[in-house]
């Protein structure tokens, strides 16, 4: 009787298969645990919301024709997209006290590892505030998302968060912070203060002050040669709470660095350009007198070249940044373009899009884009008090 020996290659393949099965089982456990805890928490005392979904965005007055564009139908689609986002991407941490937006799975040695990024986490915070309804459990979810960020400090900047974390490890490696993600986190904290007033586990004001000062310190220490996202919308919101000349200086420096890219490139924009165009669009919607006019011509020119691409939304433009995320980032600027046929086509493409299983960022950007097109986005201050949109 002959026995075939196992080669090193066979052993490696077998171990990889075992690792993949272990990841699947672990993920299944996390999903079931998340669903069970959600059911339990739905029975707890709910949190009142000061701005329950849906609200009417202040920028609707700038877009009179858009105001009449099927608000109820779009809200129904948005609610469904939000439910799918919550089901497909939000998971509880191992301790049950944290929550994270699951992203790509990476292979480390013979093991497959779940990951989450601080940018996706920051957007999840923002979405939780925007979609909160009176009496739901959004505040508890917000606190768990925030707890995850606080539990994964960045390298050399412990008050900020590591740009990438590995939620299913007892200890996750400390990596550098994503400063653009940090700005989204700060904006979400401000919105949470307006929505709920306070949190049960954390002092919103203390967390905001500590992180905003840490972001200032990180910006001062970062190399001028490092590519940064142009963030006039977010930095303006932060500057209103933490005055410092650096916010304006940083905004101008980032704009000068972005201009050559906007002039040269074609097709859907890559990560830096797309996130910057999103910021320009949001600035134009909420703060049209804050310098949008001087940036609009170049931004609209880039937008037209981006929207000329009618390729399918599946796949990535660059590692970790999908075509869906890129197109979604263009939407607020497209609203200001005031071409109804363009926005109608964008709504059709986004509402029918199916985010890839590991594309948490694309799924979150899609939700943000759909909120802007539904006209329900609101800010914490310095905008006209919105009138709730009926969904009856």
Model regions and ranges:
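Aromatic-rich carbohydrate-recognition surfaces in CAZymes
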Residues: 114-124, 172-197, 270, 363
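Alpha-helical transmembrane segments
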Residues: 24-32
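Extracytoplasmic mature domains of secreted/periplasmic and thylakoid-lumen proteins
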Residues: 165, 178-191, 197-227
């Amino acid at each position: 009787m002959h026995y075939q020996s196992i080669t090193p290659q066979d052993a490696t393949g077998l171990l990889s298969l075992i690792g993949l099965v272990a990841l699947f089982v672990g993920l299944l456990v996390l999903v079931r645990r998340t669903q069970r805890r959600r059911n339990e928490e739905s029975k707890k005392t709910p949190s009142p919301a000061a701005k329950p979904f849906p609200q009417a965005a202040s920028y609707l007055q700038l877009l009179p024709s858009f105001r009449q564009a099927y608000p109820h139908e779009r809200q129904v689609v948005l609610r469904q997209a939000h439910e799918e986002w919550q089901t497909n991407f939000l998971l509880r941490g191992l301790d049950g006290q944290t929550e994270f937006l699951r992203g790509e799975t990476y292979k480390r040695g013979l093991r497959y590892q779940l990951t989450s990024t601080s940018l996706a986490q920051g957007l999840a915070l923002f979405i939780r505030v925007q979609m909160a309804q009176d009496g739901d459990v959004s505040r508890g979810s917000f606190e768990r998302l925030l707890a995850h960020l606080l539990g994964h400090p960045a390298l050399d900047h412990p008050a900020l968060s590591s740009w990438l974390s590995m939620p299913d490890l007892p200890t996750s490696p400390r990596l550098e912070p994503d400063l653009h993600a940090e700005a989204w986190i700060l904006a979400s904290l401000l919105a949470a203060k307006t929505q709920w007033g306070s949190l049960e586990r954390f002092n919103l004001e203390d967390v905001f002050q500590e992180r905003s000062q840490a972001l200032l310190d990180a910006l001062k220490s970062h190399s001028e040669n490092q590519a940064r996202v142009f963030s006039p919308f977010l930095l303006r919101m932060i500057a209103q709470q933490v005055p410092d000349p650096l916010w304006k200086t940083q905004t101008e420096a980032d704009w000068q660095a972005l201009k050559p890219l906007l002039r040269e490139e074609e097709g859907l924009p890559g990560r830096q350009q797309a996130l910057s165009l999103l910021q320009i669009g949001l600035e134009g919607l909420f703060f049209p007198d804050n310098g949008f006019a001087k940036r609009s011509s170049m931004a609209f020119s880039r937008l037209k070249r981006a929207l000329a691409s009618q390729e399918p939304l599946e796949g990535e433009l660059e590692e970790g940044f999908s075509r869906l995320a890129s197109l979604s980032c263009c939407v607020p600027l497209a609203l200001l373009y005031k071409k109804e046929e363009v926005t109608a086509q964008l709504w059709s493409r986004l509402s029918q899009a199916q985010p890839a299983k590991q594309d948490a960022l694309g799924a979150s950007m899609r939700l943000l884009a759909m909120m802007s097109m539904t006209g329900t986005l609101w800010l914490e201050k310095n905008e006209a008090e919105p009138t709730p949109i009926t969904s009856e």
